[in-house]
Amino acid sequence: MKRLPRLALAAALFAGALTGIPSLAFAGNLPAAIDGAVTVMHTNDIHGSYKYSYNASKGTGTIGFDGLAVLYSAQSNAPDFLLDAGDTFHGQSFATMSEGKSIAELMNTFYANGYDATTPGNHDWSYGADKLRTMAGNGATSTPFAMLCANATSSNGVWSSSITKTLNRTWKDGEGSPTFNYKIKVGVVGAMDESLGSSLRADLVAGTSFSGAADAINAEAKRLREDEGCNVIVCIAHTLNAKTFAAKLVGVDTLVAGHEHINLDENVTGADGKPVRVVEAGSAFAEVGLLSIPYEYDTRGTETTNDDMVTVSAGDSDEKLYTAKDVDDLLADSNNQNILDEVRNNKIKPLDDAFESESNKVLGTSSTNYFYGEDAAGTHGWEMVRTTDLRPSKEGDTTKAQTIGHVICGSYLSLTGADPGLTSADLAIENAGGIRGGIAAGNVTAGDVIAISPYGNTLETWTMTGADFLAALEHSLEISDKCNDSYELQQAYVAAGHTEQEAQDMYKWPDDSGSVLSFGGINVTIDWTQSEGKRIVSATLTKDGSTLDPAKTYTVATNNYIITNTTDFPTFANAKKLTEWGTCEAALRALIGQDDWEHKVASLAGTISFSSAESPAPHPTPTPEPSPKPGTTITQITTKKTAGKLAATGDRTPTVVGACLIGGIVIIVLGIIWKRRR
């Protein structure tokens, strides 16, 4: 009788033990390890680009949020994460006019559940730290994307460091067989390189400080693994050099990077000796990346998951880079076209309409025409900012009237001098290629300003010596001189009956014509009869009338594009960056919104004077062709370079005279030879 309880106990223990053994259905089938992957679709540095476009002839385009929806939906399994690595809300006017809110709304709602997270880029702080920190809530209908910056501390609010997501996975051994369910937990941590914080306007980040980004990432990665039980750690970071940054990381599997505007897919050994997969997807929504991070789930041969292990092989990750061409290919499927149309019509169009309404708002009025071409439409294209704006308007003029270049440079000087707590600019420059329109007398709208400065370039201040600044201006005048040669030839060709486009095709602008500089903060006297290096006769600052000192260091306001052109302007390599001020277009908008802004430009930008009332002697030009008549054949003018200038060969008189002289000499020589033989 006493044995029965013992047998019952043994039976109970045996039955209990069975709960830890795979069911008979899995006997021999459940693998010891299951292979899987975490997929991350990612963008970076879109700079306010938002709408799909594709130029088949050039093979280039923009993916945009509508194109991104097509790529997202085309995956056999929806990506586990949609992440962004910064410089997202600032750049194109579509973004800046709403202070980034339009982009934030699209990130939240464009398709599916929208983005999971982003991290700030250096340009994203242009609206202020508080607006950036709360940007994620704009337009959100459910859970908004996360704004992650683990190394930012603010007195006005808390910055999020990371998010986690548990991925439910299922393994199945063929059709009709039982399934095995397990989970993978992923942590995403974000940060911005602390060195980028030093270039931000102090007023925009007041109350915010930045600690070491790599240290902050490592600490959060450790917490996510130990306290949150994360199996995979993904880092999104806006950093000066992604590979250098990755080498400092500990416990991170993947770095999705931004800032360098490059396509990157490499393994870097982290500070813990383990591989970190580093990816970056270009810029301006030209590319979108899809990263697959492989893992091995160790089942230990049982259905229980309490002690299962996950091994991540980050070094074996696979990166796929998509372009607008891939979207174009997918649009051959009507289902994909429907997705694109749905996003464009229901998500993008309402924001486009709001943007158009804002663009039509009048900012101020102008009493003067500030054209960038010979008329408001810019006939010939940029000819004024490349040539005539730097020359006397007509014989007898000694001072140039205000130009569109002066207006732009005046706006830079105005904005950088508006905050007494920051270093104001002494000088300003803008390159011709960055000026895409002019201002006509009358009302000036926000759209007019966007047309002038459409690229979303950033206004920055840099320090450089007076000598380096003068060297740049001198070389700019040399480029302008070559542009003037082309322009004179174009004018003659048009006068002969050709179209403006034919003239430009025949006599092309120099390749570096977009580098001609407009300048402000300085009164300059130019002598066009001199050679490069000697044309600037005098240069005095508008702020105090002092002569520009070659040995002194000055603060120069410029767009972020031209200052990096050390090919045309080698002395720019010596410049040191100080501060970022927002978009160039925003500076111009702020100026024109002020009362009596034209008077302010006149006092800030300065003047261009000429040491002689006459322009330099004109360079040789081709003899203009007669206007073509029906049925006649026109012979193309041929030109050649002579001593660096275009010389005309349309007049053949010198050639004929020379040929006669040579022929006469030959006859005389032959006569002498014949006489001697006799």
Descriptions of predicted regions:
Residues 28-323, 404-407, 411, 428, ...:
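Acidic, metal/ion-coordinating pockets
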Residues 10-20:
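Bacterial N-terminal signal peptides
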Residues 1-8:
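Bacterial N-terminal signal peptides that target proteins for export
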Residues 179-183, 295-443, 592-616:
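A short C-terminal boundary segment appended to hydrolase-like catalytic domains
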